[in-house]
């Protein structure tokens, strides 16, 4: 620490160059933090998918008959089955998108324990045909109170009377703790209310969800379910809940490749920029280093000072970029959650990896300049003009 003032002074020898270099590093690590935060959030959603729960859907995304329920329940290895439909709606405007899930209230919560809901709310919902349960964060944001009558404008589920407005009795809230999905605008309604009121696709569901006794038999049980409907017009595709989530994520494209390609390009450019800047700073200070050696600074001390300047510049700027990303991601996720996207965050492990990258970047870009400074001849340096 006794050389910190010297390191700090050397770092700001050319203020404009230092500021522009810092800004470049901040932007690069801000980009790294944002992209890795988004990627990690989606991976977390996928990893929360269970291996002992199967999801049965039509391969083309078409609705499946509710009449298939009894056949699926009879498959060996299946212990419990629930189902749900889906439509997208909005509250007052498209700024408040709602993911509406008409569910089987008798089995849905047993099948999905990640939905945390009080027994009181569950009982009232079960016995209120027009009742709805809403994600706690959404109810708080919109100021809904238990007992309110809430109109939801459906975007893809018209009613038999020709209108698209579904009116619900708000009976309570639920939460999905420790999950990015806790910010999503999910609304649960009774399937019976939805099915008897809709104009089309009556008696159908979006998917079935099966709990199985042995996760190691998931593929076998899934094939047994699909074989039941192999020759029917309503073919099915059954996979684990985790595989289903992965399939949905894959529809966005190869997110890993996208993130890695952008980050690699940014860091390659940053390495070139930082290395060039540090080498230029070294050349400008050759005579200064020679004088320092003359008055007693060792070769090793000079090289350590050069490395320390690079680490301070890179690590300090990287931390600023990462902390900005950590502050921005939850705010962006909260803003986007009203459009149905999950909450976003920057996990500590990504922050740690970013710090490691910053130190590595500093060492790789500064080592050539540090070695030259260590091997610098006093006589040759003082003779240079």
Regions flagged by a language model, labelled:
Residues 38, 42, 217-269, 280-283, ...:
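Peri-transmembrane interface segments
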Residues 15-40, 253-288, 311-320, 361-364:
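Hydrophobic alpha-helical transmembrane segments of multi-pass inner-membrane transport and secretion
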Residues 108-134, 139-140, 145-152:
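Diglycine-centered glycine-rich loop/turn motifs
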Residues 372-385:
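Short cytosolic juxtamembrane segments of multi-pass membrane proteins
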Residues 4, 18-22, 323, 348-356:
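Hydrophobic alpha-helical transmembrane segments
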Residues 26-100, 117-128, 140-141, 223, ...:
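Hydrophobic, regular-secondary-structure patches
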Residues 139, 144-239:
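Basic-flanked hydrophobic alpha-helices used for secretion and membrane insertion
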Residues 279, 283, 287-333, 353, ...:
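Transmembrane alpha-helical interface segments in multi-pass membrane proteins
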């Amino acid at each position: 620490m006794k050389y910190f003032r010297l390191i700090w002074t050397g770092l700001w020898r050319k203020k404009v160059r230092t500021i522009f270099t810092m800004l470049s590093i901040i932007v690069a690590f801000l980009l790294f933090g944002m992209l890795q935060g988004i990627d990690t959030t989606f991976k977390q959603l996928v990893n929360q998918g269970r291996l002992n729960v199967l999801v049965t859907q039509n391969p083309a995304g078409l609705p499946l008959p509710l009449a298939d329920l009894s056949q699926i329940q009879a498959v060996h290895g299946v212990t419990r089955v629930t189902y749900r439909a889906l439509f997208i709606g909005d509250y007052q405007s498209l700024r408040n998108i709602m993911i509406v899930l008409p569910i089987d209230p008798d089995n849905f919560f047993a099948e999905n324990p990640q939905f945390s809901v009080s027994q009181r709310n569950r009982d009232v919902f079960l016995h209120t045909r027009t009742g709805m349960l809403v994600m706690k964060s959404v109810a708080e944001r919109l100021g809904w109170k238990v007992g309110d009558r809430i109109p939801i404008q459906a975007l893809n589920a018209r009613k038999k009377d020709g209108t698209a407005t579904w009116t619900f009795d708000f009976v309570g809230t639920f939460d999905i703790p420790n999950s990015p999905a806790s910010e999503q605008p999910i609304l649960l309604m009774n399937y019976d209310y939805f099915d008897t009121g809709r104009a089309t696709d009556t008696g159908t569901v979006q998917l079935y969800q099966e709990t199985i006794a042995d996760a190691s038999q998931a593929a076998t049980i899934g094939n047994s379910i699909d074989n039941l409907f192999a020759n029917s017009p309503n073919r099915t595709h059954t996979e684990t809940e985790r595989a289903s989530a992965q399939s949905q994520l894959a529809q966005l494209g190869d997110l890993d490749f996208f993130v890695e390609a952008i980050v690699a390009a940014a860091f390659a450019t940053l390495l070139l920029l930082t290395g060039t800047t540090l080498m230029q700073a070294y050349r400008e200070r050759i005579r200064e280093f020679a004088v320092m050696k003359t008055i007693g600074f060792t070769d090793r001390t000079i090289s350590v000072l050069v490395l320390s300047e690079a680490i301070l510049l890179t690590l300090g700027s990287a931390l600023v970029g990462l902390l900005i990303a950590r502050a921005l991601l939850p705010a962006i996720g909260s803003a986007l959650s009203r459009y149905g996207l999950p909450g976003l965050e920057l996990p500590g492990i990504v922050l740690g990896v970013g710090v490691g990258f910053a130190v590595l970047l500093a060492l790789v870009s500064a080592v050539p300049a540090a070695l030259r400074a260590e091997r610098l001849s006093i006589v040759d340096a003082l003779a240079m003009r």
